[in-house]
Amino acid sequence: STTNTADPRKTKYYPKFDWPRVENPKIRYGKDGLTLTREAEARSEREIRKAFRTYRHDIAAILIEPIQSEGGDNHFRPEFLRLLRRIADEEEALLIFDEVQTGVGLTGKMWAFQHMGMTPDLIAFGKKMQVCGVFAASRIDEVKDNVFVEPSRIGSTWGGNLTDMVRARRYLEIMAEEDLVGNAARVGKHLLERLHTLAEKFPRLISNVRGLGLMCALDLPSPESR
């Protein structure tokens, strides 16, 4: 599993890859939030660069959710994601975004990375498409006979099928016909404004309102108050 959460159901019966994992430099809030976030980003960068030095020939990619969903609706500064882009280029590694939850219009754009001013090399999708898969940017073509060029490499027992593809295409057509991505942006803007209003009304209860499109979140003081 690539999970980084403490839920034992994710790893009790399945292997957990022994990959290098680094500090999560999620956006911090409050008056010192920007300073704390930048400090966390610097620590994360040091850990990433150390991992590349230690395992130089064993690391193929940097993998991240552009917004950590199950991890606590953690957002990252676009500057940090652009830093990951630079490091991946310097180290000749791929930058992979897990957009299984953030993708397919939820954030008000088709893909969350479109908010960030950069493009990953590989994007994983699922959930709302009712089928899981990946698509790639042009950098993948640096690998001769990659999986997108050599059809037989993707025709595995657990691979996709025509029914999935037809159904997924119809979903995309409906999304375009009904402007569902634009609607997520408009309704999400209203939702975020109303959440900020609630936070102003109940400052001791609601804090750290954040969101892109309909992917909005807030913090409560404790599980009991929730």
Task: Describe every region a protein language model picked out.
Residues S1-R226:
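Conserved N-terminal phosphate-binding loop of PLP-dependent enzymes in the Aspartate aminotransferase
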